[in-house]
A protein has these predicted regions:
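A solvent-exposed interaction/effector surface
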Residues: 1-171
Length: 171
């Protein structure tokens, strides 16, 4: 058994990531555009989406996903989608955003803190990546920069549980 090593950051402590060859995903849900200043409003998007979880036509599994895409650096902004995996897009509500996540290699980080500390974990990951010897996978407008996976162990009431951050990397 390999011992887990902790990597310290001023923002958050990270466990060493595991590496996965992720399958292609179709994600559908609600999305909005955010900036560094407005990203603190993402929980309101989740509150709007929460009643749909388990009720989306064609939903696959019980996990929910937070997908970051269309990132711009000047000025910093990004689209964020709160959604679920679906088998196809044909029956999802018209107000839902749809995004295809390609099959690719990922560095997968566990987030064990309260969900409100996820921005600190993301900042720590983005500081860790350039020093890791890994390179982020190329991305386009509709290709996710990363996604958060909220598994069955995530508790919506407490904001704690099964949360992972999946960062696409070059294989």
């Amino acid at each position: 058994m390999q011992q887990t090593r902790m990597m310290e950051s001023s923002e958050a402590a990270l466990e060493a990531p595991r590496f996965e060859n992720g399958k292609a995903l179709l994600i559908a849900g609600l999305s909005e555009r955010y900036t560094a200043e407005t990203r603190r409003n993402i929980p309101q998007l989740w509150q709007r989406f929460q009643p749909h979880i388990g009720n989306v036509p064609g939903q696959v599994g019980k996990a929910a996903y937070g997908v970051c895409f269309n990132m711009r650096s000047a000025p910093f902004s990004f689209d964020y989608l709160a959604g679920v995996e679906v088998s196809d897009f044909s029956a999802v509500p018209s107000e839902f955003t749809q995004i295809s996540v390609p099959a690719q290699r990922y560095a997968v980080f566990s987030h064990r803190d309260h969900v409100s500390r996820l921005p600190q974990t993301l900042d720590a990951i983005h500081k860790w990546l350039p020093n890791s010897g890994l390179v982020a996978a190329p991305r386009g407008d509709d290709v996710p920069v990363f996604f958060e996976r909220y598994g069955e162990g995530f508790d919506l009431r407490t904001g704690i549980g099964d949360v992972e951050v999946w960062i696409p990397i070059k294989a």
